[in-house]
Amino acid sequence: MLRGRSLSVTSLGGLPAWEAERLPVEDLLLFEVSWEVTNKVGGICTVIQSKAKTTANEWGENYFLIGPYFEHNVKTQVEPCEPANDAVRKAVDAMNKHGCQVHFGRWLIEGSPYVVLFDISSSVWNLDRWKGDFWEACGVGIPHDDREANDMLIFGSLTAWFLKEVTDHADGKHVIAQFHEWQAGTGLILSRARKLPIATIFTTHATLLGRYLCAANIDFYNQLDKFNIDKEAGERQIYHRYCMERASVHCAHVFTTVSEITAIEADHMLKRKPDVVTPNGLNVKKFSAVHEFQNLHATYKARIQDFVRGHFYGHLDFDLEKTLFLFIAGRYEFSNKGADIFLESLSRLNFLLRMHKSNVTVVVFFIMPAKTNNFNVETLKGQAVRKQLWDTVHCMKEKFGKKLYDGLLRGEIPDMNSILDRDDLTIMKRAIFSTQRHSLPPVTTHNMIDDSTDPILSTIRRIGLFNNRTDRVKVILHPEFLSSTSPLLPMDYEEFVRGCHLGVFPSYYEPWGYTPAECTVMGIPSVTTNLSGFGCFMQEHVADPTAYGIYIVDRRFRSPDDSCNQLTQFLYGFCKQSRRQRIIQRNRTERLSDLLDWRYLGRYYQHARHLTLSRAFPDKFHLEPTSPPTTDGFKYPRPSSVPPSPSGSQTSSPQSSDVENEGDEDERYDEEEEAERDRLNIKSPFSLNHIPKGKKKLHGEYKN
C-alpha cells in the first residue's frame, strides 16, 4: 500500500490547515484532457488556464495537458520542446511514425505546463474505422453531418491511443487522466473499453441538455424530475451527443461537477450523482498596499467618466461624482444570462429614483457581443466633441494661467474681465455651441445588424429607457468585447470592471459564473443568483453575503416578478449607500477573494485524484473513509461594524451623500481590525466528499 507524506494545505493567511495524505506524485503521471487547451471557446479554458500554475507547482514535470492543434493558436501560445518524460516521448514518437501529427511544448501561461496537441485534420482518414470502434465500445453512432461530433471522435480516439502508448512505457508509474466535458469524453470511453490501466475522472461544467432546455425558456429547475431525457435530446437532434456525455459520466471512476446546483442537474440529466464537487477558482494576486485596489478603482472610474462625458454630451445635466456605473457582461444569451430580468428591474429602479427625487444617476453598460457593421456615428462624434473641448480648455488654461501669473508677480489681483478677452469669450461660446444636441444620446455604441429584432433593444423600446434627461437610469449597449485599442472605450475588461461600482449577473443558467467571481477578486460588489454555482457557494458559506458585496437574487423559489422586485430592491439599496459605505463594502468584498483562490480550492481536485486512484488501483491506494474537515453549521460571519446600506442606519434618505456620518456606527469601523477578524473567521467551505443536499452517500463510496 502506497502512503504519502502528510501535507498541510494552507498557503493563505487565515485559512485553516488541511491535513491531507499527500499523493506520491513522483510515481504518478497526471493528464488533463480538454478541447479548450490552448483553444479558448468558453469558460473551461479559464478554469484550466487559471488552475495550471497551482497544479504545475504540485505535480512538476509529471503534469500534462492534452488538447487539439490549431496553428494560429500554437504560434502565439506554445513554445515547442522535446518531452523530458521517457514514456511521453516514446508515445509521441510512436504516433508520429504512424502518420499522426502530435505536437509537444510548453503553454505560455502561468505555470508553463506541458501540452500534447493532436492535429485532427491529419487523422481524418481514420474516421470511419474509429466510428466502428466507438460503436463496438458503447453502441453509439455518430452522424456524418455532425462535424463537431466527428472531430470529437477523432480527438478522443487519438487521446486513447496516446494514453495506451504512455501506459505501455510508464515503467510502473500510475496514470491519472481527467476529462473535461463531453468533447473529451470519447477518449475516456475508449480507454475504459480497452481496459487501459489508468484512473479516470470526468468533469462536467454544464450538462449538454441543460443548456439547450434553458435556452428554450423552459421552467428548467422546477421540471427537472419530469423531463423525458431521451425524448428531449432526440427532438433537439443531439441524442448522439447526449449519449456520448452520459456514457462518459458512467465510465469514469470518479465523476465531478463544478457546483452544487450543477450536481443536482447532473443527477437528473445524466443519472449519476457526482462524487466530488470541485468549485472553480482564480489566481488571486494580492497587492502589497492595502488600499491599492481602491486607488485602481478611482483611476479607472475616471476613464469611464471620460467616456460618459462624450457619450452624453449635450445632455450632461447630472453630477458624475454622484453617478454609479453598473454593468453586465458575457455571452449574448438574453434569458440565460438574466438580461431580461435586469432590464425590467432597471425600469423599476428608474421609477423609484425619480419618485424619491434622488440625485443619484445610474449608468448601465451591457457588454455582450452581437452582430454589428460599424461604430455608431453619434457615439464617435460624442468622443470627438469631448476631446476637442478638452484641447480648447487646455489652450485657454495656459493663456489664463500666464496672465494670472504676470498679475500676481506685479502684486495685483487680476480683474477677471481683463484676463478673458473677446477672443476667449468667442472660443467659449463656440465650444458651448458645439455641445448642443437635438437628439437623445444613443443606447448603443454600434450599428446593430438585427436592430429591429435584437432582444435587448426591443426590451429597451418596451420599457422606454431612451436616456431622456428625466431618466435617472441611463443604458449603453456595447455589443463588442472591450479592448484597450478601441476608439470609443479604450479599456481592457479588467480595467473596466475595476472602474465600475457594481456587476450585475442575474443568470438563470450559470453552472459556476466566473464574472461575479472576478468582480469579488477585484473588490467590486456583484449581483448573482441562487441558480449559479458561485451564488450557491457564497450563500452557503457567508452568513450575510450582502454585507460583503455579494447580492444573491432568488430565482429558484420565487416567481419571475418577485425575483425582479428583489433585484430592484438590491439595486435601490446600493444606490442609497454613501461613498464611505461603498468603500467599506469594497474592502470586505476583496477580503472574500481568499475563498476563491486555487491554492485553497485546488484541494478538492486533490481529493478527486486520490479517490479515483483508490477506485482504479484499490490494492495500491487506499482512501480512509474518515470525515474530512467540515463546517456544518458554520458560516462566514456578518461584519460587526457599519452596515453596508442605510437600512439600519440613522438616516433613511434615498440620496447618496459625500458627507460622512459621524454616528457611533461609523466610529466602530476599524478596517485593519475587521480585516484581521475576517481572516481568522474563514473556514473550509464544505466537506471534501461532498454529496448534494438531500442525497444519501452510497454504500462503499470509498471503494472501487
Swiss-Prot record:
UDP-alpha-D-glucose binds at H205, R211, R331, E510, W512, G513. Its EC number is 2.4.1.11. UDP binds at K40, R331, T515. This is Glycogen [starch] synthase, liver. One of its GO terms (biological process) is glycogen biosynthetic process. Pfam families: Glycogen_syn. Belongs to the glycosyltransferase 3 family. Residues 620-704 are annotated as: Disordered. Coiled coil: none annotated. Residues 659-675 have a biased composition (Acidic residues). One of its GO terms (molecular function) is D-glucose binding. Alpha-D-glucose 6-phosphate binds at H291, E292, Q294, H297, K301, H501, R582, R586. Optimum pH is 7.5-8.5 (at 25 degrees Celsius) (non-phosphorylated state). Optimum pH is 8.5 (at 25 degrees Celsius) (most phosphorylated state). Optimum temperature is 30-40 degrees Celsius. Pathway: Glycan biosynthesis; glycogen biosynthesis.
